[in-house]
């Protein structure tokens, strides 16, 4: 374990006890820089259980930070693992699914599946965007996920058949 990883590991209990949404960004930077598996697992576990006020807003902002690109899949997975309400941000997840990697697309699909409520107008716009993106995507795996996300949203509007 590097000295930096040991320092991060030592600071985690204090963040866990007294942390608020402002702790999220430093945790993400620590995760991006951590090389030790134990440190990475501990930070990821803390993120997946985050319940602090404004956590969703802080995580959404972190998606646009270039230095945090290596941990974007973890950021995306945090939304659904922590059960954060992101109903007003469907466009962010659809945009990330379309522009991102296949792994990011998978995490966005999981967020969409796990969020119980999405605004109807956002759903309708997203269905069109996903349909167009799937037609233009070269990666067949990602195409399948984009179409699956489209299907999930269509089902929310009562347009598609239920899938299992």
Language model segments and positions:
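Structural detector for internal amphipathic alpha-helices that build alpha-solenoid repeat scaffolds
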Residues: 6-19, 29-30, 38-52, 61, ...
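Buried hydrophobic core positions in alpha-solenoid tandem helical repeats
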Residues: 26-28, 58-62, 90-95, 123-131
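TPR/TPR-like (Sel1-like) alpha-helical repeat modules
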Residues: 95-101, 113-134
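Eukaryotic intrinsically disordered, low-complexity regulatory tails and linkers enriched
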Residues: 161-164
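Short inter-helical turns and helix N-cap capping residues of alpha-solenoid HEAT/ARM repeat scaffolds
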Residues: 3-4, 35-36, 67-68, 100-101, ...
